[in-house]
């Protein structure tokens, strides 16, 4: 089948232009004004924005954590992603300490293959470093994994500085990229012990035990290690101005550093933790925690200046019943928020319509840059001949109110409940097939695993 999208405005990382898009099978054949080649079906998209399918390079589906499992598996999570305009996710394969990378990869394929409705790939988590893990790294590249993750916090997952140095040296050999969760674990643990001794174990203590300067310190330490190795790294879910200053300082030294942030750090502030209603406060517990309003401003300015390259979600969803496990002890609240279903509309509303960022910037941080950074460009992330026909049809005038009752994710709340978005996703096409129409997910669990190459950003 050939489809001709006629009369829309095509968005790219360079700007916008009025153009038609001709699609055949899974691929885009042509993008241009007044395409005359015949099509089996003409789709009138007059007045619509046509954006490349969004890429969420930071999700946690079907993850065992805090003695429970995330509410969204690969089926429900990918359905929610598609509804939000995301046609590709890159999830984290997470072997436990003592397990091989091969075991982690096989486990995540069992979780995702034949169950995922959008296209998908995996980052590989390195939570240990030894000769076996080092020997397996080359096999990961052969399996289509070109990006990795390490933690500077969480004892069950973290690496010390020595291990991080040696792991980064190994990744440098083949041009791999590594994202790092940056928080100072030792001081966080000390602050938690102080709160326990004081009997202050309510939700409001969560952000006070993970302050911004402990994130900034870890960012600084990571970047000095990366400088010693001479390798670019990704600061995942960067939340605040202090951490951002460390990134800027490294760039001034000549380092190549990439930064990611998330909608919760752009739209919410830490007052959410002060709500006396436990349920209303606990739902926002995540790590790093949501920061202050002035940090929001710094992040938006960094996006505008091109200092933050991607906006992902860190989608890690739990039900309110799961969140209830931390009553009386905030450290037992499973940390994470849902986000894949609302990211595009929120960023358009809070960023583009307020002129904090341009439409081209939105396209770069949601689609083009993650495609380049994680080795999927130009197959993904751009609307041009030869690319996958992943298309988001966005009506900039159709307002939408976010409500948990309407969600397709497997959660019973939404962090952005009651937010009115300006504009709405009307259709989502995945490799030339209509996957979502007017909020209804049509796609089945036939997403493709994407073999990814090297970073080209």
What are these regions (language model features)?
Residues 1-53:
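Histidine-rich, glycine-flanked metal-binding segment
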Residues 8, 325-329, 385-451:
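C-terminal cap of metal-dependent C-N hydrolases
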Residues 86-90, 116-121, 146-147, 225-233, ...:
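Short, surface-exposed connector motifs at secondary-structure boundaries
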Residues 132-311:
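Histidine/acidic residue-rich metal-binding segments in metalloenzymes
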Residues 203-230, 284, 304-305, 309-311, ...:
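His/Asp/Glu-enriched, well-ordered alpha-helical/loop segment
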């Amino acid at each position: 089948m050939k489809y001709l999208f006629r009369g829309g405005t095509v968005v790219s990382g360079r700007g916008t232009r009025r153009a038609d898009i001709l699609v055949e099978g899974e691929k885009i054949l042509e993008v241009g004004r007044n395409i005359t080649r015949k099509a089996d079906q003409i789709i009138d998209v007059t007045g619509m924005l046509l954006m490349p399918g969004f890429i969420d390079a930071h999700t946690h589906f079907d993850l065992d954590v805090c003695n429970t499992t995330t509410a969204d598996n690969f089926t429900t999570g990918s359905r929610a992603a598609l509804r939000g305009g995301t046609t590709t996710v890159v999830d984290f394969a997470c072997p436990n300490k003592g397990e091989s990378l091969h075991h982690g990869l096989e486990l995540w394929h069992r979780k995702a293959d034949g169950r995922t409705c959008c296209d998908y790939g995996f980052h590989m988590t390195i939570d240990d470093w030894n000769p076996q893990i080092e020997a397996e790294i080359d096999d990961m590249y052969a399996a289509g994994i070109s990006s990795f993750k390490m933690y500077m916090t969480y004892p069950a997952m973290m690496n010390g500085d020595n291990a991080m140095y040696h792991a980064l040296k190994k990744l440098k050999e083949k041009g791999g990229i590594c994202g790092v969760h940056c928080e100072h674990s030792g001081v966080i643990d000390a602050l938690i012990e102080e709160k326990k001794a004081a009997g202050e174990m309510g939700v409001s203590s969560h952000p006070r035990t993970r302050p911004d300067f402990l994130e900034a310190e870890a960012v600084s330490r990571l970047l000095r290690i990366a400088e010693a190795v001479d390798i670019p790294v990704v600061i995942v879910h960067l939340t605040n101005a202090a951490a951002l200053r460390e990134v800027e300082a490294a760039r001034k030294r000549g380092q190549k550093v990439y930064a990611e942030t998330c909608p919760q750090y752009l739209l919410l502030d830490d007052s959410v933790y002060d709500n006396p209603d436990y349920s209303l406060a606990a739902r926002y517990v995540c790590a790093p925690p949501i920061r202050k309003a002035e940090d929001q401003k710094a992040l938006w300015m960094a996006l505008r200046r091109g200092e933050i390259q991607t906006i992902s979600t860190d989608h890690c969803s739990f039900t309110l019943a799961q969140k209830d496990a931390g009553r009386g002890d905030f450290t037992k609240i499973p940390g994470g928020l849902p986000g894949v279903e609302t990211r595009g509309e929120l960023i358009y509303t809070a960023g583009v319509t307020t002129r904090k960022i341009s439409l081209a910037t939105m396209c770069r941080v949601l689609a083009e840059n993650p495609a380049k950074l994680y080795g999927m460009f130009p197959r993904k992330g751009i609307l041009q001949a030869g690319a996958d026909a992943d298309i988001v049809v966005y009506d900039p005038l159709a307002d939408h109110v976010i409500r948990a009752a309407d969600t397709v994710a497997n959660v019973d709340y939404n962090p952005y409940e009651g937010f009115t978005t300006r504009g709405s996703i009307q259709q989502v096409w995945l490799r030339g097939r209509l996957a979502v129409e007017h909020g209804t997910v049509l796609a089945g669990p036939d997403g493709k695993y994407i073999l990814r190459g090297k970073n080209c950003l």
